[in-house]
Amino acid sequence: MQHLDHLSDTQQSLVLELINRTTHHDGTPPIAEHILLHLRYGGDKADSHLLVEKDNQVIGYAHLDQTDLVAGPCVELVVDPSYRGAGVGKALLSEVIKICGKSLRLWVHGEAEVAHSLAASFNFEKIRTVLQMSKSLSDIQPLPAIDKEIIIRSFLPGIDSDDWLQLNNKVLKIIQSRAAGRYLI
């Protein structure tokens, strides 16, 4: 396993290939979009990378961000689907914990049971869920007629703020009770 502050062009390509293979297999990217952008176009100077290679191929990757002095270090990792269950994820996460200590945030993307099992095996606790929702714009139906007594207007700060915050808090409580997301040790 290599711990690097910067990836070479070849390593960068191999990591992106791993992410593409995993995305194709799982149906969802294994890491966040901002990390993909860091990989493609250069990231923060404080980013570091852990690589596990076999047969000239990256089979495990961890992106480590230690810049958040309040919430603590954050890691996202990906293991080639062909090597899941072979200890690659466990080795990566063990090494990250050696580097960062136990105050660590781990992001898990999607519903891959193996990722959630790995987090649980290290006693991470799920603390947040992020949902991405979308709707095709090609099948939008016309809006129903609106009762003339109903007034539709823009948000008015100072007038609508309390009601909006109350509704927003109610929705966030519902969202937080759902699956998949971020874990903490």
Predicted regions and their residues:
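Conserved donor-binding loop and adjoining core beta-sheet/short helix segment
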Residues: 6-12, 19-105, 109-110
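Low-complexity, flexible helical/coil segments
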Residues: 38-43, 101, 140-144, 166-168
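Hydrophobic transmembrane signal anchors and adjacent membrane-proximal interface regions, especially
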Residues: 37, 119, 181-185
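Acyl-donor-binding surface of acyltransferase catalytic domains
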Residues: 66-70, 81-150, 156
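Short amphipathic alpha-helix that is part of the acyltransferase structural core
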Residues: 1-35, 145-182
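Short, surface-exposed recognition loops or helix-turn segments adjacent to catalytic cores
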Residues: 131-134, 180-184
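Broad hydrophobic/π-residue packing in well-ordered secondary structure
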Residues: 4, 50-53, 83, 118, ...
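Short, surface-exposed, charge-dense and proline/glycine-enriched linear segments
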Residues: 35, 56-66, 135-139, 159-167
